[in-house]
């Protein structure tokens, strides 16, 4: 979800309304585009159980943007980070 927000998802508008009104028009990562994720479960029975679903969302955009900067020297400061934005940086 966080990678999709960072790399693709964007609501588009024309002069009077939202263009991306359905899943066909709204860009989202496909399963074939999602990188493999390694999950590590830490056994800590003395600690309370916590949810982990939304924890990786905030740092994902920063991590991807910093990886692009480290590889290219270009900072991208607005989402989504698209190939066009990188080429025009």
Locations of regions flagged by a protein language model:
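C-terminal catalytic domains of large/alpha subunits in multi-subunit enzymes
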Residues: 1-89
